[in-house]
A protein has these predicted regions:
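Flexible loop linkers connecting adjacent transmembrane helices
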Residues: 36-63, 86-96, 108-143, 326-344, ...
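Selective recognition of specific alpha-helical transmembrane segments in multi-pass small-molecule
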Residues: 105-113, 187-201, 212-232, 265, ...
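Extracellular/periplasmic helix-exit of transmembrane alpha-helices
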Residues: 111-125, 224-240, 248, 252-255, ...
Length: 463
């Protein structure tokens, strides 16, 4: 118990100023080294991602969109519905400004992670592409690279145990509203997860290709209805985000008030948690893509952060702020999104939010089990990894019988801190290699970026 408390205490400390120095400072450095690529080439990035979501690929190929959906399944979770309102409740409307800023900086970090994942990927025993921090950290060279790679793999493999337990409880608890036994639901979910993951990334990709876009669109349609029902408060809500990012907010109703420091702290933490830039998890999925260059796949890293944080989180924030529920004394921080939907949809709002949270968390569980399996494979081989995924399911089902959810999240925070440190060190030190790859991608005549530009011109001329 002492060890778990120590891990939780470390996580609580880390998610203050240290996270700002590491993620924000590191992200700014990476942004400068890459020449502000997420801004300078944003139009091109959109054309290669949003513009090619439904591009056809070969039967045996794993498309960039499929792996992006798998990575999005991990980042689009309960945090998008529950975490964002908590940031508002604790840090005021200004917290959302810092969520956005972290996302803009995080685009470069995620871009770097994905590019490194593809650059350093290898073929496993089954002939599949595998990669992630546990591979690219070895690019640091010598014993330190091997140590950090192994440390990351062990850390994430263990971190996913409390994370999956907490996420599993979040998913099954949504069925309480329907009067269904949580343990039975947990067992069913566990079996479904293993059936999906057992098919490898191809099967996961096929499921996520449908599930992620549908659940995101359904949720956003509902949130937009809430926003339009409170359209008169939309502009004041947007103004408050910018105003209170740089000014304290006085207490009002059930809101206890906030300072600039609180807005920054909660906005930064939620921003990082939401898009997972700096975690190093997404490259495990992206490394499997059939793609001609690491930078082409890196564009999907920017796509992920844009969808997860700049779109989905923003819609949640505006729904909560415009509805005014965040200042009410009747609701707890974690129930603000549900309250906003209830004000418009009535009792149906409870069911709508419960279903959305379940779908978001279920997709996250699938992605996380896959990530954990990859760590186990790196450390102990393919056979052990196939057994290890069942260990995750067992812990998830046991969690449905009742666990201290707060402690699980605190332990998760501690382990996340431990794995983010080596991953960010790797990204910062190795970003020079990505800068070189970027030059190759954007400047090689007749290939990659320039070939795409010429193809676009030819298409226009043909019209």
């Amino acid at each position: 118990m002492f060890i778990l408390n120590a891990i939780a205490a470390f996580g609580n400390w880390f998610w203050g100023l240290p996270i700002l120095f590491l993620i924000v400072g590191g992200g700014i450095y990476i942004t400068f080294r890459l020449g502000f690529v997420q801004f300078r080439h944003f139009g091109y990035i959109c054309s290669q991602t949003f513009g090619k979501m439904f591009a056809k690929t070969g039967d045996d190929e794993i498309s960039s969109f499929s792996v992006a959906c798998t990575a999005l399944a991990s980042s689009i979770g309960a945090s998008n519905i529950v975490g964002v309102p908590v940031a508002i409740a604790m840090g005021g409307p200004g917290a959302i400004f810092w969520v956005w800023l972290i996302a803009l900086i995080g685009c470069a970090t995620k871009y770097t992670e994905v590019a490194l994942g593809v650059k350093y990927r290898e073929k496993n025993e089954d002939g599949e592409w595998v990669g992630g921090p546990f591979y690219y950290l070895r690019g640091l060279g010598g014993g330190i690279g091997k140590f950090l790679g192994g440390f990351y793999a062990i850390g994430l493999m263990i971190e996913l145990i409390p994370s999956l337990a907490a996420q599993g409880l979040s998913a099954t608890s949504q069925f309480a509203i329907f009067g269904v036994n949580q343990v039975i639901v947990g067992v069913i979910i566990g079996v479904l997860i293993v059936l999906v993951v057992a098919g490898g990334l191809k099967r996961i990709g096929k499921v996520m290709d449908i599930m992620v876009p549908v659940m995101a669109v359904v949720y956003m349609v509902g949130a937009f209805i809430v926003i339009f029902a409170n359209i008169g408060n939309l502009i004041p809500a947007i103004v408050s985000i910018f105003k209170y990012a740089f000014a304290p907010h006085a207490a009002v109703g059930g809101f206890a008030g906030s300072t600039i420091a609180l807005a920054l702290r909660w906005g930064a933490a939620r921003g990082v948690y939401s898009n997972e830039a700096g975690f190093g998890t997404a490259p495990a999925a992206h490394s499997s893509a059939d793609v001609d260059h690491p930078i082409r796949q890196a564009c999907w890293g920017v796509f992920e952060v844009t969808v997860d944080t700049l779109i989905v989180c923003t819609v949640t924030a505006l729904a909560v702020l415009a509805s005014g529920v965040w200042t009410s004394e009747k609701y707890e921080a974690g129930a603000l999104a549900q309250a906003a939907f209830n004000n418009v949809f009535g009792a149906f709002g409870d069911y709508f939010v419960a279903i959305c949270v379940f779908l978001f968390v279920f997709s996250t569980l699938i992605a996380c089990v896959y990530y954990g399996q990859r760590q186990a494979e790196f450390l102990f081989g393919v056979k052990f990894a196939k057994i290890w995924r069942w260990i995750y399911v067992v812990f998830m089902v046991v969690a449905t019988t009742g666990i201290d959810l707060t402690m699980m999240y605190m332990i998760t925070d501690g382990f996340l801190a431990a794995i983010m440190i080596p991953n960010m060190i790797g990204c910062i030190v190795l970003v020079g290699q990505i800068a070189e790859l970027q030059k190759e991608y954007f400047n090689t005549p007749g290939k990659y970026y320039l070939a795409d530009v010429e193809a676009k011109k030819a298409k226009k001329a043909a019209k």
